């Protein structure tokens, strides 16, 4: 994802990420738990969102860090350092390139309802851009470590967790329903429909039930493979 205005990318400047980019990230993180209702819509989605699989489980962000939820990819920050890395024989200074930087929201998978997900991300990002405290929120949720490393357990314990099932995702969507319905962007019936569908899976303790049961997991994956 990137922020553009007047056909110009506003994610970075010559120093690094802009304040508006950090605010945008803070907004997404603020609604990340309920955004899974649109981005992770089947029970097997939550079998992926577990520690130590380069998949996010906690609400945080960072640079080139595969343990975080919102990731800033390497390459276009701080005067395009990646170009020098890829071309070590390059002698001349690389000109600053402002138009390439993106950020990744790493929770969604192939089950995502892409239209509702993108609408939700835009609303969340807008909230972050407009909120007065969003830079502080971004600062508090930034990590530059592997949060799943045992030596960083103290930091891990300060972070909010993503839901672990469709059922719990629906709970977060219900909690944030007023936010999504504001200004009529998401009709009430749309939110209620997502909640009803997600809770109907009745998968609240599915991960615990399937732990180390490879055949049952395979059967479930096969069942939901073509769900969309």
Kindly label every feature range from the protein language model.
Residues 139-228:
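Acidic, glycine-enriched catalytic cores built around paired aspartates
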Residues 1-135, 139:
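Active-site capping/gating regions of soluble enzymes
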């Amino acid at each position: 994802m990137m922020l553009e205005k007047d056909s110009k990318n506003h994610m970075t400047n010559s120093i690094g990420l802009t304040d508006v980019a950090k605010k945008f990230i803070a907004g997404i993180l603020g609604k990340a738990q309920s955004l899974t209702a649109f981005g992770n819509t089947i029970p097997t989605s939550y079998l992926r969102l577990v520690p130590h699989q380069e998949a996010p489980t906690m609400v945080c962000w960072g640079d080139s860090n595969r343990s975080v939820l919102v990731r800033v990819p390497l390459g276009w920050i701080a005067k395009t350092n990646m170009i020098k890395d890829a071309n070590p024989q390059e002698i001349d200074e690389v000109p600053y390139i402002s138009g390439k930087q993106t950020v990744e929201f790493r929770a969604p998978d192939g089950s995502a309802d892409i239209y509702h997900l993108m609408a939700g991300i835009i609303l969340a990002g807008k909230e972050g851009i407009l909120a007065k405290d969003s830079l502080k929120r971004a600062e508090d949720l930034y990590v530059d470590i592997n949060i799943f490393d045992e030596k960083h357990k103290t930091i891990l314990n300060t972070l909010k967790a993503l839901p672990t099932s469709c059922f719990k995702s629906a709970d977060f969507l219900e909690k944030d329903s007023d936010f999504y319905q504001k200004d009529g962007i998401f009709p009430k019936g749309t939110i209620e429909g997502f909640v009803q569908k997600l809770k109907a899976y009745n998968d609240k303790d599915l991960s615990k039930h399937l732990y180390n049961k490879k055949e049952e997991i395979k059967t479930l994956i096969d069942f939901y493979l073509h769900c969309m």
